[in-house]
Amino acid sequence: MLPLIDGKEVKRRWSGRLLAREGVAARVREIIAAVKREGQAAVERYTLELDGVDLKEAGFRVTREEIGAAYRAVSPDLLEALRIARDNIATYHRRQPRGSWMETAADGTILGQICRPLGRVGLYVPGGTAAYPSSVLMTAVPARVAGVREIALATPPRRDGTLPPLLLVAAAEAGVEEIYKMGGAQAVAALAYGTEKVAPVDKIAGPGNIYVTLAKKEVYGQVDIDMLAGPSEIVVIADGKARPDWVAADLLSQAEHDALAGAVLITPDAGLARAVGEEVTRQLEALPRREIASRSLADYGAAVVVTGLDAAMDLANSLAPEHLELYVSEPWSWLGRVENAGAIFLGPYSSEPLGDYLAGPSHVLPTGGTARFYSPLSVDTFLKKSSLIACNRAGFRAAAGYIQALARAEGLEGHARAIELREE
C-alpha cells in the first residue's frame, strides 16, 4: 500500500497533483465575476447549486441562538480540549514580535517602522468531507492576538443548512461572532468584494480546496491573502530505530485528509521501509476514512530508501513539505540541515497531530513546495507595516546633494528640484 519508489518519482507525483485543470480555473473566474456583478444573489444561487442549501431557508449569518444551541450540543470534555488548544495557540503567538520601532540618527533624522493590525479580515474554514473546528482556532486566535478589530468567518453549510456545533463553539471561544454559511469560490469573492450582506475585508486567510485556492489567487490584489495552500502533506525522515507502527500512523494521519494528500517516508533502512509499508496496510483496515487514505497513498504516498540521512535531508529540502518529522536518534543534531519546511517535528513523541491540534503554532502552513518562500500563518499575517521618516534641516542638507545626483542620473528632474528648492 506504500509504494517503494525513488525521490525523482516522488517529486514528479507531488508536482502533478498541484496542476489545476483550466476548467476549474475558468469555473472559479465565472463564479467570482457573478458575485461581483450580482452580489448576494450569486452567493445564494451557487450555495444552492453546489452545496444543496437554500440560504433563504437556512439563514445566511449564524445567529446567537444557533451558537447557544451549539454550546448545549458540545460535551464538557470537548469544550475543555478546545479551550486548552485556544490558550496554547494564544500563548505561542503572543511570543511573536510585532512592535513598532524608531531610531534617531546623529544628525537628528528619525527613522522607524509602525506596525498596525489589519482592520478587517476574512477567515475561510473548509467543510466538505470533514469539519475543522481546529482551523477556526488556528486562524482566528492569531488574528485576535494581532489586534484585528473585525473578523468574518466563512464556512460551507452542511446539507441540512446547519454548521457543526463544535465549529461554532470554536468560533465563539476565539471571539468570532460574524459567521457566514458560505463556501467555495463564492465565499472568497463575497469576502473580497462584499455583497449586500457581507462587508469586504482587507485580507483572506485559511485553507480550502482547489476552488478556494484558485479563488484566492484571482482576488489577490483586491485583497491580500495569506498563501496558496494545497493538499496536506507530510515527510517523515526515520532511521532504523524508529517504530514502524508509529511512523505508519503519522503517515496515515495526513493521508486521511484528502485523496490528494501526500505522505512520504524517507529512510536509509530498507527493513524499516518494508515494515512501515506492512503497518500502513494493517492500520488502514481499522481507519474510518480508509478509502480516502488508500487513494492518497496509492497516488502520492511513498517509501524512499536513500544512502544515508544526509541524502534524506537533501530530498526533504527539495520537496519543501508542509510537515517534516525528524524521527531519528538525534533529531536536534539534524535540525540545522532543514532548509525548507512549514513545520518541523523533532523526535518520536512529536507526532504531527500535536501540531494540528494543541501545541500552539498555527497548522495553516505552506504546501506544494511553497515552504521555500512562504511562512506559516502567524501574527505577522494580520499586521501591516508603515515606514516612518522624519528629517530635520541638518539631516536634509547632509543628504540633499546625494539625492539630486541620483535623481538626475535616473532622469527624474522633478525629484531633484523638490530637493533643490529646499536648499535655497
Swiss-Prot record:
Keyword set includes Ribosomal protein: no
Pathway: Amino-acid biosynthesis; L-histidine biosynthesis; L-histidine from 5-phospho-alpha-D-ribose 1-diphosphate: step 9/9
Top-rank EC class of the record's enzyme: oxidoreductase
CDD domains noted in UniProt: Histidinol_dh (cd06572)
Short name of one Pfam family: Histidinol_dh
InterPro entries: Ald_DH/histidinol_DH, Histidinol_DH_CS, Histidinol_DH_monofunct, Hstdl_DH
SUPFAM superfamilies: ALDH-like
GO cellular component terms, A-Z: cytosol
Family per record: Belongs to the histidinol dehydrogenase family.
Function: Catalyzes the sequential NAD-dependent oxidations of L-histidinol to L-histidinaldehyde and then to L-histidine.
Protein name (Swiss-Prot/TrEMBL): Histidinol dehydrogenase
Organism (species): Moorella thermoacetica (strain ATCC 39073 / JCM 9320)
Gene expressing this chain: hisD
